[in-house]
Amino acid sequence: MNSAIYPLGRLGVDDYLQGEQRAEVKHEYLDGQIFAMGGASRAHGLLALSLSALLLPHARRKGCQLFTADMKVRIDHDSGSWFYYPDLVLACDPTDREPMYVRRPCLLVEVLSPSTEHIDTREKLLAYRLLPSLREYLLLRQDSLQADLYQRAADGRWQHQRLTAPGDVLTLECLGADVTLSEIYVDLADLSVA
């Protein structure tokens, strides 16, 4: 199935969610409009898998759930709803158990690709900040050793940290976990970080 399973025009949330169960291609949803998502590169997949493997033991210890790529995040705002598919979603709220999406993530991760970088660094950055539960948003480049971490401070303001050296330590407060960039990028030897 593809986008043809969706009716033309504005789409309601229920129709979108039902369509996604049958769709062969994932779609993000922005106030009634759907946008098909493309496939990921090898580097993209390796980065997401590596970080997932590093974080999963911490998530289990904290009683959190870690999802990769196929879990939607729902953002409700004044004029409607948005659904995105982050590369990693960490949900630590035990009451956040919708079967098809997460409403209250603690951490969201996007691996940047050339076709989506402008969306991940602008649109999604602004949209994700609307989630009161979100404490951290991590962006990983797949073409160079670089991580951009946005963290919500106690006063509600967002702080940005860029890491670019193999030994730089990424501290994820949601999990109380520290990982180095070299651990995340271990499978990308062509970036000379392994």
Language-model features: locations:
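Gly/Pro/Ser/Thr-rich low-complexity, intrinsically disordered segments predominantly at protein N-termini
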Residues: 1-194
